[in-house]
Regions:
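RNA pseudouridine synthases
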Residues: 1-259
Length: 259
């Protein structure tokens, strides 16, 4: 059985059930002549255990396809050649480089992010642009196309309860990145940090092990008076809040001294 708490996706050890499901998927792809060529390029994949069974997803496109039987669909499918995105993208690509092309490209990307609408376990829904803007951020290109958000969004849309999750690499390494076939990796922080933090709201999630690490190694207050505080910060601890829900030195000081 999986633990009662859902997987903390940015730093985790996959459960035995997730490992077994991933191994079964790897074997299925390897033995299926129709699937094997689609993933030959190498692909990050994901497995989600729910109260209704297991779900599977791949990141981005596989063999140029966004929808493949046996895998959850993308949050938003922009690949229709007759759709607004592809037609506008083609017009922009044909333009001469310059300010207008850059502006139209940015507008199209923003249009796309407003099409990606995701939910959390509380039943709340926001689009990707809104989620990032609440943190004063602009979503990077490709946000929403990773396996983890696809899995969670599909589960929520079907009324399934997520229990455990893992993302692993299938195939050969590519693009200069060292990836090991079958090895599990944490969710990316740039694209998936703000997104998954929203989508996991309402679920009881495993604690961030880095938080536990910091609680064991509290900052040492060296000097304090009415105006200043001098603190020895543990190695690796963030000075100010970042993209992930990790305790920073500023969080610690505000909690302890109330200012």
């Amino acid at each position: 059985m999986s633990s009662a708490r859902f997987t903390y996706p940015f730093r985790y050890v996959p459960s035995p059930e997730i490992r077994h499901a991933a191994h079964s998927l790897i074997e299925r792809i390897g033995s299926d002549e129709s699937l094997r060529p689609l993933f030959a390029e190498g692909k990050m994949m994901g497995v989600l255990q729910t109260d209704a069974g297991f779900l599977y997803a791949f990141s981005g496109l596989a063999g140029g396809r966004a929808v493949i039987d046996g895998f959850v669909p993308p949050i938003y499918d922009y690949t229709d050649p007759e759709g607004y995105f592809r037609k506008t993208e083609a017009r922009i690509s044909a333009m001469t480089d310059g300010e207008q092309k850059s502006r139209m490209s940015a507008e199209l990307q923003d249009w796309l992010f407003h099409r990606y609408r995701v939910s959390n376990a509380r039943g709340e829904s926001l689009d990707i642009a809104e989620i990032f803007s609440r943190r004063g951020l602009v979503p990077p290109a490709g946000t929403g196309d990773c396996a983890a958000p696809r899995l969670l969004q599909y589960a929520y849309s079907k009324g399934m309860k997520p229990l455990a999750m893992g993302e692993f690499w299938y195939g050969e390494s590519r693009g200069g990145k060292v990836r090991e076939h079958g090895r599990f990796y944490p969710a990316c922080t740039g694209k998936c940090g703000p997104l998954l933090n929203f989508m996991l709201e309402g679920l009881e999630v495993e604690p961030n092990p880095m938080d536990r690490e910091y609680h064991r190694r509290e900052p040492e207050t060296i000097y304090i008076d009415a105006d200043i505080i001098v603190v020895n910060k543990p190695a690796g601890m963030l000075s100010v809040p970042g993209k992930l829900d990790v305790v920073s030195l500023l969080d610690y000081l505000r909690d302890r001294y109330g200012r």
